[in-house]
Amino acid sequence: MLICLTAIGGAQASSYIENGQAGDPASWRSSEFNAEWGLGAIHADQAYAAGYTGKGIKLGIFDQPVYAKHPEFAGENKVINLVTEGIREYTDPYIPVKKGDAFRYDGTPSVDSDGTLGSHGTHVGGIAAGSRDGGAMHGVAFNAQIISAENGDPGPEDGIILGNDGAVYKAGWDALVASGARIINNSWGIGITEKFDEGGYDPAYPHFTVNDAQKQFDQIKQILGTKPGGAYQGAIDAARSGVVTIFAAGNDGNLNNPDAMAGLAYFVPEIAPNWLSVASLQDPTNTGDYSISTFSSRCGYTASFCVSAPGTRVYSSVIEGTSLENLTTGYAKYSGTSMAAPHVAGSVAVLMERFPYLSGAQVAEVLKTTATDMGAPGIDALYGWGMINLGKAINGPGMLVTEQDIPEEFLVNGAYGPTQFVVDLPGVGAVLDKGKPTERVCSDVLCGLDFWSNDISGHGGLTKQGIGTLVLTGNNTYAGPTLVNQGRLAINGSVTSDVSVQNGGIVGGSGTVGSLTARRGGTVAPGNSIGTLNVAGNVSFEPGSRYAVEVGPNGQSDRIQSSGSATIGGGEVAVTLENSSNLLTQSEVRSLLGQQYNILTAQQGVSGQFDAVAPNYLFLGTGLSYQPNGVTLSVGRNGTSFASVAQTANERAVAAAADALAAGNPVYESILNSGTAGEARQAFRQLSGQIHADIASALVNDSRYLREALNGRLRQAEGLASSSAIKADEDGAWAQLLGAWDHASGDANATGYQAST
């Protein structure tokens, strides 16, 4: 544990008005911000100005208890102190406890081996997530919730493996994981023996190496899975569960490597993606520049999962006194990698809010790959990846890491996860980590749409999953493939890798890609509305793929522009109006009549054709023409003639005559806009004149009914059909109802008709 250099009291403001403004980092640099120099060093103000403060994130502190009643943690449930209990496994020579004793921790401050109340956890908690409320200082993730579990460790760290009581630590690990904490900060370790401490900074003396750490791990390995090994098994289990597990590198000087606790992921490589070790940096006001603290252990063999953060003279919350009766609260400056680690923990919390859809391992990769390089170029033995930089990290990863990106000196086989960085934007409202203690609803709009602006390098590849949209605006040189499996990937910057759109995926944007392949079910939709997607290499459309083209009335359209060749093996071209997701309506097609659009150009030539183009209506639609180096889309008359939908010779004659009329003729335009063949045939009948002959025929035919009625009445007068005699001196009346239904069949020459009287 570390030494308090100065203690300064402070009180929280009774009411607080936030003066920090969105988009203005300088507005966040209040006196409260400036009191903790580490915040400015890691560019936390840029994260705050972008709207990210760790809100909604549970941040675990495994240490001496964080004193929840300290005014730095004012507010409901700002600090949750977990209760752990059990039977001890170790007799500690520094405090009066022995193996077999019962223990119970509930957040009540405990007494250190020097007789004073343990303030270490409270100081660490303030750095990680102290509240921003106008008080003396605030932490990195000031809106995060602290979950505190006590490790019962009064110090010192003496290199004894069993000294970290297996029962006490395992209870704490299990409680923290069960609480839903996504991050666990550990500002403690095993330590190294006096053999190495005696050497100080003299290179002539022995110093702690990876081989010495291996000897420690050999002892640890023997007790994994047992009660005495709970401190180590618990750490492994936490990291395996997906919790980002952070360890201070140690305070043994720049010539010593971290102990096997901070370096546990080196020996258990599968947990390395969720593991971070942390070296300490000095306050530049004392040194003129950021550099490793003189007391800090180097990153050493942990370099590929190690970062550096402020750890010298860090101002944060403390408690003082020798008992609860004389406990007081205040603030003090402490130094140590114990102070560096919570800067990292708070930063991870901020990034978890920033990237709610990323796993803990992915957030850790973002933090590592955006660190400011220090010391020797790239990953080095002193600083690891370098000093964490929240201002850059909020813009996405800086590298997609595989083993090929790690210097051989620091390479740990099997420690870097999959070669594809899978970005799953599941959509707003999706449930994440279902069934785990960290289960949560992704309620942020970022789960549906996010922008990454960093330039991304590395040997890994990018896989887009989920229904949401990811937009890349940087100049990306990562070497692995870009796979769009679901949702939309918009490339507005550049990607030098090969881009492949799978079934259910959409690729778009107005940037440049290395090559482009659209597979069955995949869609290419250039632009962000209308725009051009540039391809440095070749383009390929496979059978069943789709090319979605937006067009505008001004002659502009989406376009693919390739410096290589274009191979079209089928698929469909679907045409929509600008800013619409639906195919062109008939009226929209009519409004674009005569327009032509260059939708694909390839300097090395175009081969093959698309299977279809949509939409197509009765007489209007879209069509494609192919040139040696391009494909042109035309909007206008399709190949369906007016006469082809006519049914009779009369209709065909009229249809052919109408088809020969010039565009703009009202008869031609009326037929052109017919929605169905039936509508067109009705127009042909009206124009053919057949109705006049049909009326004459019907009138002649129907006239017989009146004639027959009169003749029938005359026959009555002759007595031929009268049922009763009518006297000469009587009046009479005669009435008869007439009705008829006529039908005339048509033939190839003329249509039939129906009539009723």
Where are these regions (language model features)?
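Hydrolase catalytic cores
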Residues: 125-128, 149-154, 311-383
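Extracellular S/T/G-rich loop segment that most often corresponds to the catalytic His/Ser-adjacent loop
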Residues: 63, 84-100, 264-349, 353
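Extracellular repeat-rich scaffold modules on cell surfaces
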Residues: 330, 337, 342-343, 350, ...
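C-terminal subdomain of the subtilisin-like protease fold in secreted/lumenal serine endopeptidases
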Residues: 36, 43, 174, 183-185, ...
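Extracellular beta-strand/loop-rich repeat segments of large surface/secreted proteins
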Residues: 506-595
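Outer membrane beta-barrel translocator domains of Type V secretion systems
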Residues: 665-757
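Subtilisin-like serine protease catalytic core
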Residues: 16-25, 35, 45-165, 179-182, ...
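Substrate-binding/access-modulating region of protease and related hydrolase catalytic domains
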Residues: 16, 53-55, 116-119, 131-134, ...
